[in-house]
């Protein structure tokens, strides 16, 4: 959902 996920 964010930078890596």
Swiss-Prot record:
Q: Which UniProt keywords apply?
A: Amidation, Neuropeptide
Phenylalanine amide is found on 5
* Name used for this protein in its record: FMRFamide-like neuropeptide RYIRF-amide
Q: Which family does it belong to?
A: Belongs to the FARP (FMRFamide related peptide) family.
What GO biological process term is on the record, naming one? neuropeptide signaling pathway
Q: Which domain of life is it from?
A: Eukaryota
Per the UniProt record, the source organism is: Arthurdendyus triangulatus
